[in-house]
Amino acid sequence: MTLDLHELKTLLDDVSEGHRLTVDEAENLFKVRDRSSFFITAAADALREKRCGNAITWVKNQNINCSNVCVNSCGFCGYSCKPGDSKAFELTPELVGEKAALAASRGVTEICTVSGLHPAYDLNSYLSIYQAIRENAPGVHIHASNPMEVAYAARKTGCSTREVLEAFRDAGVGTLCGTAAEILVDEIRDVICPEKISTDDWVRIIKESHNAGIRSTATIMYGHCESVTDQVRHLSILRDIQDETHGFTEFVPLSFIHPGTPLYRKGMARPGATGREDMLMIAISRLFLDNFTNIQVSWVKLGLKMVQIGLMSGANDIGGTLYEESISSSAGAKAGEYLDPADMRYISEDLGRTLVERRTDYSPVH
């Protein structure tokens, strides 16, 4: 169904007054293609202001990628290598500790670590990584791993995913990365990441994580071979989980970076999302995910100019400094590995909004 202008404005007014968007209504919003898109972004930004105020938040964090060696071969990934590849690397716990110590010296409040599914990794491998971080960066929040890594550690160790999560928690993991979600539609997963866990397993592990006291982020990767219907199914799954667990700290839309990926080179994906699609993904996420407070716009994926558009389209968070970033850059992203808070302040002040440093749980640092 194509919404005429009157129908669009009426729907947006209803949402601003508390109406929960249906799946069909969200699909219709995603299909808006002309300047009426700006009515959607304006409504989303007004809702952002009502829900979050005018602060733009950011976190001083450092990314540590422990290895790019991976048993999987996801079509959207330009980062992973097989054992013996010339670009393959693996950090020992000692090297992870050195990076963690450097991060601590920079004053970060969060260290984020993810890894390829290394064939030699088991639960103890992950625990040794967390121990190295904890010992070398005491007091720094550990934001680590994702449901795929949890499932992998469980399989390699012969224990349950719940036991893995409890071990992660006891080792100091504060929050789980909500990545490996991609698109939570198995027909699409079978194309882009057939070796990854199913939608049901991802949902189950995320719920187990939340129930174990480990909150997580939530993500979507869009702009490849999925449809608008698939996108909204994904958002609906996340909204249902949040209704049940209240365990998501934020939602992070991740725009597909195409140039260096097998999926694109084989003609199985389009060349990423358009600017309109990026803008509407942020805006409609704000309108549809009425039980999420925080919507993050990814500078790594979009670059600073599009980030600023996202901050006018419903987003309230700009992510982190990172210092190191390998996964998106390997796929062809050009935004770099580090975002200076001075640049964050520049675009925030240009919007007449205040930049506020936060912790992982969104409490202010100062």
UniProtKB/Swiss-Prot annotation:
Keywords: 4Fe-4S, Iron, Iron-sulfur, Metal-binding, S-adenosyl-L-methionine, Transferase
Matches recorded under InterPro entries: Aldolase_TIM, CofH/MnqC-like_C, CofH_family, Elp3/MiaA/NifB-like_rSAM, F420, FO_synthase_su2, rSAM
Database matches in CDD domains: Radical_SAM (cd01335)
Residue numbers binding [4Fe-4S] cluster: 70, 74, 77
Entry-linked Pfam families: CofH_C, Radical_SAM
EC number: 2.5.1.147
Catalytic activity: 5-amino-6-(D-ribitylamino)uracil + L-tyrosine + S-adenosyl-L-methionine = 5-amino-5-(4-hydroxybenzyl)-6-(D-ribitylimino)-5,6-dihydrouracil + 2-iminoacetate + 5'-deoxyadenosine + L-methionine + H(+)
Co-factor remark: Binds 1 [4Fe-4S] cluster. The cluster is coordinated with 3 cysteines and an exchangeable S-adenosyl-L-methionine.
Pathway recorded for this protein: Cofactor biosynthesis; coenzyme F0 biosynthesis
Alphabetized GO MF terms: 4 iron, 4 sulfur cluster binding; 5-amino-6-(D-ribitylamino)uracil--L-tyrosine 4-hydroxyphenyl transferase activity; 7,8-didemethyl-8-hydroxy-5-deazariboflavin synthase activity; iron ion binding
Record-annotated Radical SAM core domain positions: 51-290
Cofactor: [4Fe-4S] cluster
Assembly mode: Consists of two subunits, CofG and CofH.
Matching NCBIfam families: CofH family radical SAM protein, F420_cofH, PRK07360.1
Family of this protein: Belongs to the radical SAM superfamily. CofH family.
Annotated function: Catalyzes the radical-mediated synthesis of 5-amino-5-(4-hydroxybenzyl)-6-(D-ribitylimino)-5,6-dihydrouracil from 5-amino-6-(D-ribitylamino)uracil and L-tyrosine.
Protein name, UniProt field: 5-amino-6-(D-ribitylamino)uracil--L-tyrosine 4-hydroxyphenyl transferase
Lineage of the species this protein comes from: Archaea, Methanobacteriati, Methanobacteriota, Stenosarchaea group, Methanomicrobia
